[in-house]
């Protein structure tokens, strides 16, 4: 079973600044509990960099495919053994002075036997996730409406 979902939200940052929030270290700023660990010891945005995250007692291994700050894009391979594996892509596009639209796409394949493991990334739930991300980024940026 495979799930491909995508969504968008707007942020009050230029695309060039916004992409920094979607790097392994940048997500520390706005994602509660996000604490990437680097087997090689040091953070890096280089292609091939491996980092690990944990959520709810489940570990996910990530590999940087590419972080292109000038192009305001990022791509990662990720695997959560026994659950799912796939690719995550982020693209930031300027929409107005100091504002950009963030596009996020997940392409995940089920590794286990329980299709429910992909539900969080299914279309309806993905929209909710994008809303949560939008609010979290806005709160980090100090938006009083967040």
Language model features with spans:
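Hydrophobic ligand-binding cavity/cleft-lining segments
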Residues: 1-43
């Amino acid at each position: 079973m495979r799930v491909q979902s995508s969504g968008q939200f707007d942020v009050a940052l230029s695309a060039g600044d916004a992409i920094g929030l979607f790097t392994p270290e940048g997500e520390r700023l706005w994602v509660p509990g996000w604490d990437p660990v680097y087997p090689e010891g040091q953070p890096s945005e280089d292609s091939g960099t491996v980092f690990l995250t944990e959520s709810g007692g489940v570990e996910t291994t990530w590999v940087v495919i590419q972080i292109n700050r000038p192009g305001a894009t990022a791509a990662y391979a990720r695997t959560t053994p026994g659950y799912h594996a796939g690719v995550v892509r982020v693209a930031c596009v300027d929409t107005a002075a100091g504002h950009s639209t963030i596009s996020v796409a997940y392409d995940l394949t089920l590794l286990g036997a329980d299709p429910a493991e992909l539900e969080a990334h299914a279309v309806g739930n993905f929209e909710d996730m994008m809303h949560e991300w939008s609010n979290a980024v806005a709160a980090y940026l100090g938006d009083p409406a967040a």
